Amino acid sequence: MKKERGLALAACAALAALMLLFASQCSPLYPINLWDDANCLLTVGRVMRRGGVLYRDIYEQKGPLLYLIHALAACVSDTSFWGVYALEIPALTAALYAAYRLLRLRTGAGFALGAAAVWGALTVTSGSFMRGDSAEEFCLPLLTAALALAYAEYGRRARPMRAKRLLLCGVLAGGIATIKYTLLGAMVGLCAVEGALALKEGGAPRALKSAGVFLAGMAIPILPWVIYFAANGALRDAYTAYIYNNVFLYGGEAASWGQRLGEMARYVQKNALWAIPAALGLAALAADRGETAAVRLCVAAMAAGQFAAVFFVGRVWAYSLLGLAAFGVIGCMQLHRALKKIGCPRGKKALTAAACAASLLLAWFATPNAFLRGQKIEQIAQGRLAAAMPEGATLLQYSHLDDGLYLAAHTLPREKYFVLLNVQLEAMRDALDRAVREAVPDYVLVSWRVLPAEFDRYELAASDVGYDDDNRLNKTLYLYRRKSE
């Protein structure tokens, strides 16, 4: 068994490295990751690498573990996304291996590895994967592992989870909480089922024991951050930026139910190759009398909780559905059950190899990022604009998110508010206005629209056209230079 698992883990690592090499814009095959969200993450990580304290010295809105990952990535490469690619590999490896272990509960080793590979390829080529490097991507292994643990426990007995497994689930939940806490819906569903089983077995004392074990696990990845921020006098900054502002100030106008349903249909369509199998698999599992009632209830509760978290907590973005991708593995499990009814095919090793090879071909040909693969940084807007800036010049992205010029120009923001985030925060807008009005940075970058005329201490130095989120060359970038006094 250990040898089998070791070989499976090695295969998952190789598959992850190649899939991401082909499909993620963080890989060495791409000149830069064009996604503004990913650039924000890496810019913050680069600032942290140089000693900046998150939330206190530089403002962003996601969880601290995500920025630590990017600080480590900046240690690998401070001038490219190669470090992010290096850290994407263990994340996807863990997700593939968790999927393998989940499938292995009900299938043979060959099918489990082949199905995990195909699931991984469908995930990294889906619309929700975007250009690579999202909070959802780094939460995927944690969510898939939690699903595998829950299935392993409740699939063998309708009793509360054993303490060590429950503690580990708590650790996974704590990891998610320190990356993006709005992705905790699946863990809420797991806790609801665990609480019900504990109450049934031993009443309130048993339920409190389960709650204590789970919360103790959550505290393991959370407490070090509390200590870190307290030691740096940034505890209030962390609470305000990550909790308060995201709850009360994030996003724009509330979407109507019609708008939400429209978004749901559109995003499901862009992720149909794993979303439809996930939905069919969940429906088949709910009706599968060969599984325990506890596991059917738990998986349904986890899926419902995550679905609610993705679609009804805050705004829905193109990448949001990646938080549901773990449930695509349930579709693979139910496919195996259906295949067993008509007889298992022979040549399992050959089929496994074929599935793995097909997954790599899929990652190469089906990724929507292929348009950028093989280009050089000098061929795209970020590289050309960076060439217009002298070495050592300071920069501020005045409007929109980070378009990648901080990275391409090998510079870092000097201001706490370095981009315009989707947070209705007056202090951020005022700080950006003040920096440009007082001509603090040498250069100012704006996207889509020209710099307002009131900021007359800058002159246009260069403009270029970059790619928008639909991979079209229609996003105009304007680079302004401070006028000589």
Per-region residue spans from a language model:
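Hydrophobic, aromatic-rich transmembrane alpha-helices
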Residues: 2, 97, 269-296, 300-306
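Perimembrane helix-loop-helix junctions
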Residues: 2, 186-219, 286-287
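Transmembrane-helix signature of polytopic, membrane-embedded enzymes
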Residues: 99-124, 140, 158-159, 164
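Transmembrane-helix motifs of polytopic, lipid-linked glycan transferases
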Residues: 86-106, 145
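Short periplasmic/luminal acceptor-recognition loop of GT-C membrane glycosyltransferases, typified by
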Residues: 192, 371-425, 432-452
